[in-house]
């Protein structure tokens, strides 16, 4: 394969005039309406985005004739351009991305000119501000991001706490900048693998000592070598323009039969329901009516679940291309910064060792250290969490360099040392075995120290906890304490064992006071959003539960292949990764892996508008969390024949064009979607002119009304590429960080309604993702071969049912709220099938009511010797058989294209029944009570520990046994019904066996689906709870009375009537 440099001078044939020869897109038009011509020498067809990329980051010359590109009208200037008059017109604004940053500088100026000695409070604005004294927040050039030399590396900022005392907070807020290349990519018509292989071969060929001879003495060989070097550089530049990801459709041989069977099943279902409705059972009308209503609901539920899986897709990422574009070796990394959130509440339910492993895997992630910041939210204000995080930061100084030196996976020490694999595979350093043994010993000592802290925390002293310096712990009262921030690690705040910097690690506990609504996890996440925006302001945010560690150290790079893609990234609100779990037995009795949902449902949604947000393992675009809409894609339309004949000018005023775009977007925006967006802010300030201070003041006041009373935070929301202002000091930033986590900060703002995690449901993840999709954003589903994250699944039936109960309760809350997808957001840009998926997500708990009734029908039919269908005819047999065959065919073809095993699919079907008749049923009634009567149900956190001897063990057991009663009752009812039916058939003769088989099949269908529940009930700690025994005895007594009433052993043969025959009959 020839390189680009070798073929550059050859004439290229078969060139389509209107097609870009780099990216195969349309060349497009100039602002004057003429065809865009990048090179005026050879007119080689190149589109404007590729032209701009070549000028900015390429070789700045035409690919065919090698003539240097001239600066065209509307193009930004680059170093080396000659002075050309008439080019700096209004078109330049189109490519002037840092315009937003100028506004943010002005916004911050109002805050910083108030004086350094003032306390945090209501913002005060000066009447006049000089332009010459406005502090610079950022600039067009790359800045170092370092604070002034007078700033200390670590300093103490105090916050007033109860009793008038002051609490020290360690701080290290130096932040490196980050730039994002937003130009489109091209050259997508050459295979990546072949080109890289060719480049490597040339690298090996040209490797050798560099000669110092003069150019005149080297001859033609050296000229060829220099040409090869230029060709290699051109090859790398070409690869950097390639797309960072690719969407791969399911092969038609697998997806088309699946779609055909779905349509066939829909037709059969309609014919089946028509038969059921038109053929009632006269002697069992009530049973028939109940069964038909249940079947109609099941059909509706199946439609809502099935059709969002119509367009499943796979995705591939190219990490090498990402590195070539943003992270080249020997150059400063241009990868975007990522703020990682870890949330925890109760360290006794969520063991500190589990949280520590999650934090260690984050600190050791394969990403530039100055681009990673880890924020740990302790919403329980536990001193145990604080001290264990301090121990974790010390152990990280040894663990992180060990991971990066030997490239180990996973980078959570507990799971790395517990993995039963050949840890010597692919390891070539002779020191690895010795270092691994030493590190394992270090980790065991670290575990002992954490266990000692846990043991100490079990006995709280009467006077409360006291810190090492003798001061009381501010969080002794978990419902009344100040905000706390502690920076453990960071730039210039401590190095690892080899002298390298470590990612920033920050402990955060938001302020809580009586009388303020805290909104549980959603409120804690929003507090982290504000703190991180003030201290580091990474443009992307990764959200992890405390028990979900990073299993793939390149997970962040996988997400950046979508979020930093110039074409796709601007439209993406988040990248969702599937949840994978450790510690599950191979049988997976309770469908803990949830493979059907993660490998089938979410892949189907990825082909529509993207997967739903599942609460963890998700990388967010910070702009989307702020409630902004995505940029509108401008579709270039060809001019009509009439406009050409009229000869009208196609050059439009830029302001009129903006108004037109706003009107166009307004037609697709829901009335509840925020009216603020970056374009409106820019236009308002730009229209009045930078000299109009009144307009600037009004813009800031409107933003502070939306985001809260913090000028520093408001300014950070306008910085598209993130970062902190170089002029700010660590003292001011930490003081502002304490302010934004105060309990009253969100009052009279849009937090929780339009910004951040949305309030109103215990499952805040569904609402948050739904609001983003309703605004027009799309999400991406990323499934790398090595799972990105792994977590701890519930290990027993009790934890699993309580977890499902919480999810279902959140769905019921959304169903009865104003954000219900059945009626919310129809003026927005939510796609139809995506709405189907969200509707199914909210109404699925309601299915528990018809499911419970339908599972009870077999036993009732067996007891009463009636059935839900009339005598089966040949036509009815065909409909029943066709329906069952279509159900099995759909499942088989679904497993075929998704790769899900039949055992996983069957376990999912079983747990759908188990959860439906237990947790979902309770969630419906508790949700109705909460919405209508205001009776709130408090849920404890799902335990991640192996034992259950906590303070809430009795309450936990009571809740578990309450969920146990409905499925236990169903099992007993159907088992007794089977015995009663068989006994009746034995005493009724041969003719009663035929109808009995249909009833028995119906009953066994219920029993088989509940079998894992029965097995779990009998196997829980080798004992059955007392209340379950009492209920079982009670139910057995009830059905014993029914048995006597039925009296199956009494002869059913009747003789002649004595009244008719007389005595001599």
From Swiss-Prot:
GO terms for molecular function: cellulose synthase (UDP-forming) activity; protein homodimerization activity; zinc ion binding. Its EC number is 2.4.1.12. Changing residue 617 to E: In cev1; reduced amount of crystalline cellulose in roots. The keyword Glycosyltransferase applies. UDP-alpha-D-glucose binds at residues 343, 349-350, 379, 520. Residues 433-457 form a coiled coil. Expressed in young plants, flowers and roots, and to a lower extent in leaves and stems. Localized in all cells except meristematic cells. Accumulates particularly in root caps, root hairs, epidermal layer, midveins of leaves and anthers. Not present in old tissues. It is found in: Cell membrane; Golgi apparatus membrane. Its cofactor is Zn(2+); Mn(2+). Palmitoylated, in part by PAT24/TIP1. GO terms for cellular component: endosome; Golgi apparatus; Golgi membrane; plasma membrane; plasmodesma; trans-Golgi network. The chain crosses the membrane at residues 261-281, 284-304, 843-863, 875-895, 911-931, 962-982, 994-1014, 1024-1044. Residues 656-670 have a biased composition (Basic and acidic residues). The active site is at residues 379, 765. It is a multi-pass membrane protein. The keyword Disulfide bond does not apply. GO terms for biological process: cell wall organization; cellulose biosynthetic process; defense response; plant-type primary cell wall biogenesis; plant-type secondary cell wall biogenesis. Residues 1-260, 305-842, 896-910, 983-993, 1045-1065 are cytoplasmic. Homodimer. Interacts with CESA1 and CESA6. Interacts with STL1 and STL2, but not with GOT1. Binds to CSI1 and CSI3. Interacts with PAT24/TIP1. Belongs to the glycosyltransferase 2 family. Plant cellulose synthase subfamily. This is Cellulose synthase A catalytic subunit 3 [UDP-forming].
């Amino acid at each position: 394969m020839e390189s680009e440099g070798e073929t550059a001078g050859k004439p290229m044939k078969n060139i389509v005039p209107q097609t870009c020869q780099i990216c195969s897109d349309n060349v497009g038009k100039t602002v004057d309406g003429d065809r865009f011509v990048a090179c005026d020498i050879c007119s080689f067809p190149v589109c404007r985005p590729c032209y701009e990329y070549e000028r900015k980051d390429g070789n700045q010359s035409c690919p065919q004739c090698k003539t240097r590109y001239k600066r065209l009208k509307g193009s930004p200037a680059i170093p080396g351009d000659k002075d050309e008059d008439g080019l700096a017109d209004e078109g330049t604004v189109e490519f002037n991305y840092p315009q937003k940053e100028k506004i943010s500088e002005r916004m911050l100026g109002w805050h910083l000119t108030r004086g350094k000695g003032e306390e945090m409070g209501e913002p005060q604005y000066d009447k006049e501000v000089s332009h010459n004294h406005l502090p610079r927040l950022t600039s067009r050039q790359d800045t170092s991001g370092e604070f002034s030399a007078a700033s200390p590396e670590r300093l103490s900022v105090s916050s007033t706490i109860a009793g008038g005392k002051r609490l020290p907070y360690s701080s290290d807020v130096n932040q490196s900048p980050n730039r994002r290349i937003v130009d489109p990519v091209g050259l997508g018509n050459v295979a990546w693998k072949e080109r890289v292989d060719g480049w490597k071969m040339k690298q090996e060929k040209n490797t050798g000592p560099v000669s110092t001879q003069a150019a005149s003495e080297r001859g033609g060989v050296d000229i060829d070598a220099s040409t090869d070097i230029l060709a290699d550089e051109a090859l790398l530049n070409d690869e950097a323009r390639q797309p960072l990801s690719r969407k791969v459709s399911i092969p038609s041989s697998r997806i088309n039969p699946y779609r055909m069977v779905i349509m066939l099943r829909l037709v059969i279902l309609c014919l089946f329901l028509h038969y059921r409705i038109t053929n009632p059972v006269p002697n069992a009308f009530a049973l028939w009516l109940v069964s038909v209503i249940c079947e109609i609901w099941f059909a509706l539920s199946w439609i809502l679940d099935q059709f969002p899986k119509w367009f499943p897709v796979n995705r591939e990422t190219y990490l090498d291309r990402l590195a070539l574009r943003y992270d080249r070796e020997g150059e400063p990394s241009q990868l975007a910064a990522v703020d990682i959130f870890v949330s925890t509440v109760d360290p006794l339910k969520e063991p500190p060792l589990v949280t520590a492993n999650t934090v260690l895997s984050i600190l050791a992630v394969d990403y530039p250290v100055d681009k990673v910041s880890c924020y740990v939210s302790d919403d329980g204000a536990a001193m145990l969490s604080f001290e264990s995080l301090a121990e974790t930061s010390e152990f990280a100084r040894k663990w992180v360099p060990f991971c990066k030196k030997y490239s180990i996976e996973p980078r959570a020490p507990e799971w790395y040392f517990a993995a039963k694999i050949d840890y010597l595979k692919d390891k070539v350093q002779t020191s690895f075995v010795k270092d691994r043994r030493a590190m394992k010993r270090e980790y065991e000592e670290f575990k002992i120290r954490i266990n000692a802290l846990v043991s100490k925390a079990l006995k709280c002293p009467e006077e409360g906890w006291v810190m090492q310096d003798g001061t009381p712990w501010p969080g002794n009262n978990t419902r009344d304490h100040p905000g706390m921030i502690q920076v453990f690690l960071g730039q210039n705040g401590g190095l690892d064992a080899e002298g390298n910097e470590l990612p920033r690690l920050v402990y955060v506990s938001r302020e809580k006071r009586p009388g303020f609504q805290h909104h549980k996890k959603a409120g804690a996440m929003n507090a982290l959003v504000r703190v991180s925006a003030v201290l580091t302001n990474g443009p992307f945010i990764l959200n992890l539960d405390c028990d979900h560690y990073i299993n793939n150290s390149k997970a962040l790079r996988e997400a950046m292949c979508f979020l930093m893609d110039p074409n796709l990234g601007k439209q993406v609100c988040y990248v969702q990764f599937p949840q994978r779990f450790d510690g599950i037995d191979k049988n997976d009795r309770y469908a803990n892996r949830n493979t059907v949902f993660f490998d089938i449902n979410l892949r189907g949604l990825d082909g529509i508008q993207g997967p739903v947000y599942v609460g963890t393992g998700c990388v967010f675009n910070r702009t989307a969390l702020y409630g902004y809409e995505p940029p509108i894609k401008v579709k270039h339309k060809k001019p009509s024949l009439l406009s050409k004949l009229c000869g009208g000018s196609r050059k439009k005023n830029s302001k009129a064009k903006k108004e037109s775009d706003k009107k166009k977007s307004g037609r697709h925006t829901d009335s509840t979607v925020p009216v603020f967006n970056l374009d409106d802010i820019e236009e308002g300030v730009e229209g009045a002119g930078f000299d109009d201070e009144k307009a600037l003041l009004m813009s800031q006041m409107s933003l502070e009304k939306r985001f809260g009373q913090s000028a520093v935070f408001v300014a950070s929301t306008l910085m598209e590429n993130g970062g902190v202002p170089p002029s700010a000091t660590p003292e001011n930033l930490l003081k502002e960080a304490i302010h934004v986590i105060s309990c009253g900060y969100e009052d009279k703002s849009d937090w929780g309604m339009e910004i951040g995690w949305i309030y109103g449901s215990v499952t805040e993840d569904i609402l948050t993702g739904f609001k983003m999709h309703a605004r027009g954003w799309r999400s991406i589903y990323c499934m790398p071969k090595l799972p990105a994250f792994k977590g701890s699944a519930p290990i027993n039936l009790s934890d699993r049912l309580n977890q499902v109960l919480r999810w279902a309760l959140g769905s019921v809350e959304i169903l009865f709220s104003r954000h219900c997808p059945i009626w919310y957001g129809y003026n927005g840009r939510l796609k139809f099938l995506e709405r189907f998926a969200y509707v199914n997500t909210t109404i699925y708990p309601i299915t528990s009511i018809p499911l419970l009734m339908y599972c009870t029908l077999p036993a009732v039919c067996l007891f009463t010797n009636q059935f839900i269908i009339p005598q089966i005819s040949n036509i009815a047999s065909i409909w029943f058989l066709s329906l069952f065959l279509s159900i099995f065919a759909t499942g088989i073809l679904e497993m075929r294209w998704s790769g899900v095993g039949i055992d996983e699919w069957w376990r999912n079907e079983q747990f759908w029944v188990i959860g439906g008749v237990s947790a979902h049923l309770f969630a419906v009634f508790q949700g109705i009570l909460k919405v209508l009567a205001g009776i709130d149900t408090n849920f404890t956190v799902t335990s991640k520990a192996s034992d259950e001897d906590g303070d809430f063990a009795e309450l936990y057991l009571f809740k578990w046994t309450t969920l146990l009663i409905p499925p236990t009752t169903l099992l007993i009812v159907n088992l007794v019904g089977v015995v009663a039916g068989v006994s009746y058939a034995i005493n009724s003769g041969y003719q009663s066996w035929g109808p009995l088989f249909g009833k028995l099949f119906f009953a066994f269908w219920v029993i088989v689906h509940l079998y894992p529940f029965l097995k779990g009930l009998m196997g829980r700690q080798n004992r059955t709870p007392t209340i379950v025994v009492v209920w079982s005895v009670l139910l057995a007594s009830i059905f014993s009375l029914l048995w006597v009433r039925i009296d199956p052993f009494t002869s059913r043969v009747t003789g002649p009537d004595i009244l008719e025959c007389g005595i001599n009959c």
